[in-house]
Design a protein with these regions (language model features):
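N-terminal helix-loop segment corresponding to the beta1-alpha1 unit
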Residues: 1-119
Length: 119
């Protein structure tokens, strides 16, 4: 965990492209403790991604129930969830806002897309 104004804030980031990883990098720079969920089997992974600096990473197959449960256990202890998938993806994976907020009512569920949830 770093120092800074966000020290002590726990964030679960679902790996994506563009603004999501950049946002998480800035939050990490300000001291947030970030765990990035990478797709299992993806080439390279966050180890080689300069945009994933300052955070830990775990690779999971989110189509497997045990991986979804592992994510939910992380989410139970998180302050913020950040995702940037296409609309409906998190819901299909069983990780939509309704499910996550039942596990952690204080969670801030952040979505970041280029065209919103209906575009």
């Amino acid at each position: 965990m770093g120092s800074g104004p966000l020290s002590g804030i726990k964030i679960v980031e679902f790996a994506g492209i563009g603004p999501g990883p950049f946002c998480a990098s800035l939050l990490s720079d300000m001291g947030a403790d970030i765990v990035r969920i990478d797709r299992k089997g993806a080439k390279g992974g966050s180890k080689y991604d300069i945009g994933s600096r300052g955070r830990r990473s775990v690779a999971l197959d989110l189509k497997k129930p045990e991986s979804v449960e592992a994510c939910l256990k992380l989410i139970e202890k998180a302050d913020i969830l950040q995702e940037g998938f296409r609309p409906g993806v998190m819901e299909r994976l069983g990780l939509g806002p309704d499910v996550c907020l039942k596990r952690n009512p204080k969670l801030v569920y952040g979505r970041m897309t280029g065209w919103g949830q209906t575009g």
